[in-house]
């Protein structure tokens, strides 16, 4: 007989109202005072877990993209803390860069003051989200105690021959007045920040020799088993390895110099009918016919206005000019004209290309445009040779018009021609990469100073390590025009470290991506005054276990961080090969836009009378409703503070996590935000109704009294422990927060129905588990509930619950029956029924008989405990 002395009657109870703002402010203050989220020194044999979001630029305000990033990381950190890991979850600021300098110019304020003000505001915004951040480890890249070590890394690169200065054609942003790396120019040839059409300039610049690490960066992509395939593919393509042959064409000049061309298709050498150089190549000045110098100058002016991406874009017409010079094809001694063309870039391969129009579509288009010869040397196997072809043939086939190689397979001839060239000393095997050295010079003030001085006597001289940091001067007059603001400043005047004579400091500052290429290391050892990081601490915490950030950083930041990690490893400062073990690239947060399809104009929502049938207030034309990335220009941004003020941080967190899987784009929906708020209100009522009758704490010994349960208690325990199992699986397998919250909703519904029919022991166990598995998602409500029900300590210090397999056992369950994969009904079946018996029962069911003709079927698929699928 069931003991009902402690059963609960809930009908007469009134729940307190849910007031998230009061609860959240209370617990945020409490967590700060208690230092709850400080990183604890790992105990002996305790596992560590490093959870990190890509740190933000301090623009002054968080946007919903930030919120999604940081909440995702926070949930992961909280769950691992409850699972017994020593967790490191820090935050910092990627504070150098153009926006702060431009804002300072506009407002007539120094960038450091502007930046610190923004950091202070954004830190308070992050606190309002209830993030479990260890603020004692906060880092700001624009502070000298941080950039001292950025400069130290630069010196290590310089000592290793990996940092160098050279004159180069660079991408110039005419609006921001600075140089851009190739990666910072979009497909339309525009600056990634200002949107201005990028120009070309010849300037002396600092580079990092990332190309020395191209092969290992490519090879180690295979070790990144917990990175998205999309990111790995993007990096692999960017590195762009090509294995081929360097072929020397002898120039018809007095000196008889060679022009080197790299190709992956030596089998097409007989089909080469012209050679193409980059317009910027210095050899062009030497080879050009004097009569064509003006034409050359005009062509170079035209090319200087194009970005590299514009010049090489597929489908775009290619332009060129003959320069009046010739070279000899080494395979057949034919005389080939030399051209320059916009599609050949000086930094790729050898800067020269052999034109094989019959077997390369781009070369064919160019040859047809300028009436250059087209010579076919490969034909498809078994196909009769045609006299005239209009399409390039780029596949393997049979050699023709190729002297002694005629009739042989083209893929076999590749090696034969290569060996012939090596033997005759006009070819060599070579591997090239699309990846180019990292240009780090920036002609702006607000960046990390490059620790180099220029001496008329000693040349380029690095600053001594003991004299770091080279401080960025203060109170600089910023105009935003021309060269670096530091160039003509008194600050540049210094003494040469070698000869002690007059010297000049380097006036360029570093690309901000250098600052962010190593910050994850400094969080581990933030107060180390002797080294960047203690190697033992690095071994303990690295690599970052979970890194979270946007897909837009797939090439820039992530590739640079991998490069710097490998350099520091080679310098024996750290032991790891890769910085980030697991990478999650969250999708964008999108808002609804109202767009006039005819004009392309975006209309603010507050200008529209009827949202359901929106019209342009100016023209009366119908508007398109489209979800797009949130931005001011599209009038679809949502201020996180507004949402928190109205609904609370827990609601904002729950919506962000529930609306879409983390890697997918999220469409903002006010109705769904309301839905999450109502769910938390229901949970609040459930918990508050519980506290009025629950005189035992969550830690009561009566929790152990789980024998002789009635059917309602069995059902509740099964629901609770199934939720533990499913939510744990959702979090372990792909961070599926949306399905985890769905399980929470199911559990709360079942508890709402069954709590009043159960004894205190079952109620306490159920509430304890509910609050614990809720806590990573809605930390404030969970903490208040835990405190209200007199749980010991903080809920965030409790163990993550483990499910009881015995609680999941059932005498019977509903077996879903599918016919050809579609659900057609279900039948009750005994839990111990095996696969063979299930198959028989399913085939004899009324459901199966209804769909099977003459009882015939192809196969039966049984998933024990869940479903059977009959394929017919």
Swiss-Prot record:
Any one GO molecular function term: aminoacyl-tRNA deacylase activity
One Pfam family named in its UniProt record: tRNA-synt_1
Alphabetized Gene3D superfamilies for the sequence: HUPs, Isoleucyl-tRNA Synthetase, Domain 1
Motif ('HIGH' region): 56-66
HAMAP family membership: Leu_tRNA_synth_B
NCBIfam families on file: leuS_bact
Name the UniProt record assigns to this protein: Leucine--tRNA ligase
Species: Prochlorococcus marinus (strain MIT 9211)
